[in-house]
Amino acid sequence: MATSAPLRSLEEEVTCSICLDYLRDPVTIDCGHVFCRSCTTDIHPVSGGRPVCPLCKKPFTKENIRPVWQLASLVENIERLKVDTGRQPGEVAREQQDTRLCERHQEKLHYYCEDDGKLLCVMCRESREHRPHMAVLVEKAAQPHREKILNHLSTLRRDRDKIQGFQAKGEADILAELKKLQDQRQRILAAFEQGHQFLWEREQHLLDQLAKLEQEVTEGREKYKTRGDGELARLAQVISELEGKAQQPAAELMQDTRDFLTRYPRKKFWIGKPIARVVKKRTGEFSDKLLSLQRGLREFQGKLLRDLEYKTVSVTLDPQSASGYLQLSEDWKCVTYSGLYQSSYLHPQQFECEPGVLGSKGFTWGKVYWEVEVEREGWSEDEEEGDEEEEGEEEEEEEEAGYGAGFGYGDGYDDWGTDEDEESLGDEEEEEEEEEEEVLESCMVGVARDSVKRKGDLSLRPEDGVWALRLSSSGIWANTRPEAELFPAQRPRRVGIALDYEGGTVTFTNAESQELIYTFKATFTRRLLPFLWLRWPGTRLLLRP
């Protein structure tokens, strides 16, 4: 059975540092260290002088050796208190100090040689090899290292506490963020549930009204059929009688001809309207409601997809890239065409001949969205609606007259002639038309690579690093080769530009009606910038928001 820890500690205190056994007849020397009396007799003087303490190296006089009776009594008591009687005295000390015994002398290592960096026992310390060296007690030599370790431990404990604090705070932040996400999940579900409920109610309301109309039409159909069948039966009877009368002999026929024809006078037969005018009117109103529903859902879907999928960004124009033909507002969000080259200094990044300008902020990833408003003098909503109404009336008149639908929208597209006329055009006339198209008053909105050419005449097409729409009073074109003419339902006053860099698309929409106008597809490898081009007096391009 093992000895208790306090008893073992006492055993170490009453162990002689020389013989490593219990102190037998313990005595103290001048320096205060205690050894067995017999062990002190083995300590010889140094170089003819006085002997020195094996532990602290202080000289002492053997005549001053004094017994320590209290310690001797303590040794006896410890021996009596030993639990493990089978263990010999000093065995505990040896068990605990085996790893600290001198390999040569099997003595306890009390000293540390600072010259050789080795632990020494008393015998090694007195040997010829280490006697000239600086040797100190192991406890004293270990103290600086212990202090360094303790300081390092203190630093590590502070770091541990900081990490634990950061970890606790991080865990709290994570839990808070998860709570936010859970709350947002519930809000999303509630929002969609509310939307589903609203749409379901509107759907049921419209379907109920439509069912009532269907019932009215069905009831009218029964009445119409019943009355028509009655009229047909009456006419069938009259026809049958008249057919029989017509087959009678002449004498019999002429007996009551006057009375017979009087009985069957010719009446105006019934022609009823199968559908009441009020029902037709309400059906037409339903058609208008359906168009409004489709338009509203299209606008809602477009805006929702844009807001959820794309990040709306605020962009500004780069004045260093602006052509001398253009004038920028102070906030760099509006550009106008001056018609005169007003720049006295040509910046390296400036468009030289083309009236173009780039945005100040570029994009190399993500999905972003911004808008460009085309503000044209004389473009009022009333005028546009009037033009569309007049155009619709003209188209109806043309259709009634046997003509095909026109090409117009807004101001209308001109029909330049028949296919035969187009085929008869020479190469020179085609080149003249291309030149006329190039100088056509118009504007372009889109995106461009940051490396797009700025000098000389440019085509500003996708192969040149520009993906843009061209707008004019005559129509809209995708600036491709060849140009693709577009026919949106409405002329856009505000063009939405949605850039999906990773997806490789640039999508243009009518920002007001959410109508899709055109989508470019490409693989982007460089930074893309907003791009505006304006050669249209009286027109301003404004970046939104």
Swiss-Prot record:
Zinc finger residue extent: RING-type: 16-57
Membrane-spanning intervals of the chain: none
One Pfam family hit: SPRY
Amino acids binding Zn(2+): 102, 105, 124, 130
Protein name (record): Tripartite motif-containing protein 26
Keyword terms of this UniProt record: Coiled coil, Cytoplasm, Immunity, Innate immunity, Metal-binding, Nucleus, Transferase, Ubl conjugation, Zinc, Zinc-finger
Superkingdom of origin organism: Eukaryota
Catalytic activity: S-ubiquitinyl-[E2 ubiquitin-conjugating enzyme]-L-cysteine + [acceptor protein]-L-lysine = [E2 ubiquitin-conjugating enzyme]-L-cysteine + N(6)-ubiquitinyl-[acceptor protein]-L-lysine
Gene Ontology annotations for the cellular component aspect, listed alphabetically: cytoplasm; nucleus
Domain B30.2/SPRY: 295-545
Modified how: Autoubiquitinates upon viral infection. In turn, autoubiquitinated TRIM26 recruits NEMO and bridges TBK1-NEMO interaction.
Region of interest called Disordered, as start-end residue ranges on this chain: 376-440
Similarity remark: Belongs to the TRIM/RBCC family.
Quaternary structure, from the entry: Interacts with TBK1; this interaction bridges together TBK1 and NEMO in order to activate TBK1. Interacts with INCA1.
GO biological process: host-mediated suppression of symbiont invasion; innate immune response
Sequence ranges of Acidic residues compositional bias: 380-401, 412-440
